[in-house]
Amino acid sequence: MAAGSGSRMGADRPKQFLELGGKAVLQRTIEVFLEADPDITVVTVLPEQFISYWKDYCYSRNFICPQILVKGGITRFHSVRNALARIPEGALVAVHDGVRPLITPAKIRELFDLAENCPGVVPVVPCVDTMKVLQPSESKEIWSEIPGCEADRSELFGAQTPQVFQSEIIKAAYGMPYDTAFTDDASVVSRYGKSLSYTMGERLNIKITTPEDLILARAVTAALEEGYSL
């Protein structure tokens, strides 16, 4: 999934096209999946106005990767629905954020293996910070706690991607009407009534959303290229 606009990044182009170790973030993300499975079918969802940009980029960098290019929708939900229209029955579908380039091939293969025997599997990481349930106050810079509403950190996990599903299940789930409560694919499939499995993700599988995220991703990429291993 690379149909986001990247408005929080404050850059002159969407964050999936920003440079990470000499390559576009999106190229690095796709390359990890190809390393995990060279025969994988890649469906790339992009903002309509950047499809030609991506084609030109791939040509100029000699990035040879058969891709099905799909126009993004008005929300992430609609973008995924557009992509699923190109997916056959009887397949495993990994829906991944194009701006999570630090996922490892080993984790991708593990998720596909787990999804063979369940409706879907979602990688998660435990929350390490103390969590607070807050509400806005009169000041834009200050929030206040909601009385009697406590968050138990031991029960809280952050969901990552790729989230992997049986194609029949996720395609049927995305046939439901859109709801603003759908924040990821797991929330859609859960609403459809399917019980999902969750497994440990990777702490470095960050989603590049802000300038600070890009700084961290560049530091990790540089360390890996110098020989450090995850």
Pin down the residues of each PLM region.
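Short beta-strand segments
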Residues: M1-A3, T44-V45, H96, P123-P126, ...
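N-terminal glycine-rich phosphate-binding loop and ensuing alpha1 helix
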Residues: M1-S52
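Hydrophobic packing residues within well-ordered alpha-helices of enzyme cores
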Residues: M9, W54-K55, L111, I170, ...
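Short helix-capping segments at alpha-helix termini
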Residues: D37-P38, Y59-P66, E89
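Residues at the starts of beta-strands that form the adenosine-phosphate
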Residues: I40-V42, G120, S195
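Conserved beta-loop-beta/alpha segment of the NTase-like Rossmann-fold superfamily
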Residues: I68, I74-E138, Q160
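Conserved alpha/beta core of the MobA/IspD/sugar-nucleotide pyrophosphorylase nucleotidyltransferase superfamily
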Residues: I74, F157-L230
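Short, flexible, basic/aromatic active-site loop/helix in glycosyltransferases
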Residues: K132-T161
